[in-house]
Amino acid sequence: MHLSIDKLSKAYGFLWALRDVRLDFQPGQLAALLGPNGAGKTTLLRLLAGLIVPTLGSICFDGAEFAPGNSGLRRKIGFLSPADHLYENLTVGENLRFFASLYRRPHDAAIEENLAAVQLAARQSEYVANLSSGLKCRLSIAKWRLLQPELLLLDEPYGVLDGSGVDLLEDFLLAQCARGGIVVIASHHVARVLRLCNRAVILHQGRVTFDETKRQPWPSFDQAFGEFLPHGDP
């Protein structure tokens, strides 16, 4: 999948959350989306997920303009966030079976495999409502592992994960990119995502102020980051 964003803008009344964003993403890119609170990161992710519509501009996948009503394209997009939709009145296993049917993915063995990968195989019969926030996040990882979206968007995924959960998440993201997917992750854990990602995009006041792929002779993304984010931001 090739993702192209052209002149993308989003206004809420008189407030512009995004202004004239132009970005292109190639298969295999794992991009960090960085910036201070209110920079427009979540707005951009929600636009890419088809959850809101742009005021101006376009989003194209492989040359085809994306509209929220395009269910075929929607099935190629995953959005992992603290508000990732899970059915709390269903069990862990029932959730994965439901989403597998919705996205037309294989059941049974694949579900077992993905629950085992996030260490939830023994909890398949537990109701999601009874899980901790960290375990719900692991279930979301299993869900998107199963569904294999071509574009995976993540909004602050680290908050409720313990150390082993973080490792599971990052292994999954690297595997997604290795198979040709695109991953865009918004996070305030700057040093962590810059070590993980091969591209960094910084938003400030709704505009792209920095966009570079990881390359030498940069010793690390950490040093580059401080030059482009306004002083005092995380």
Predicted features along the sequence, with ranges:
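Conserved ABC ATPase "signature" region
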Residues: 97, 108-123
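Catalytic Walker B motif of ABC-type/P-loop ATPase nucleotide-binding domains
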Residues: 152-155
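Conserved ABC transporter NBD signature motif
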Residues: 57-68, 73, 210
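H-loop/switch region of ABC-family ATPase nucleotide-binding domains
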Residues: 187-188
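Helix-to-loop junction immediately C-terminal to a conserved catalytic motif
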Residues: 49
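The feature captures the beta-strand-to-loop junction immediately N-terminal to the Walker
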Residues: 34-36
